[in-house]
Amino acid sequence: MRHGMSGRKLNRTSSHRKAMFANMAASLLKHEQIKTTLPKAKDLRPIAEKLITLGKGGTLHDRRQAHAILRDDAVVAKLFAVLGPRYKDRQGGYSRILKAGFRYGDAAPMAVIELVDRDPAAKGLDSGPTAEANDDDSEE
């Protein structure tokens, strides 16, 4: 019997699952909205909520705990400088999951997980090389 067992295995080893959710949490906090499968979004939500609660605390211990999960200095800095103060008056419920149809190819249910009161300008911010960056390199 699996009474009281929370979370899904998602056909991954525990280390792969831990790394995947750390990367997904960092992406969610960085871009404030990501698209993924519905089961992954449902498992990511409590991780992200706990990280934002740490960001509201702001102590050195909270910062170290967040860094142990995220492993990204820029995202940890944003968590404590931007997201923590933004949600200081909200008692939980920092994210929402919206269903986004089914994926072409395997018909997996997709979802968009986003932060409540998100900044629309953060979406896609610093997400990799762009055409503008390539043009700047060719001019040198």
Curated annotation (Swiss-Prot):
Keywords: Ribonucleoprotein, Ribosomal protein. This is Large ribosomal subunit protein bL17. HAMAP family: Ribosomal_bL17. The gene is rplQ. GO terms for biological process: translation. NCBIfam families: L17. InterPro entries: Ribosomal_bL17, Ribosomal_bL17_CS, Ribosomal_bL17_sf. Pfam families: Ribosomal_L17. GO terms for molecular function: structural constituent of ribosome. Belongs to the bacterial ribosomal protein bL17 family. Part of the 50S ribosomal subunit. Contacts protein L32. It comes from the Bacteria. Residues 121-140 are annotated as: Disordered. One of its GO terms (cellular component) is cytosolic large ribosomal subunit.
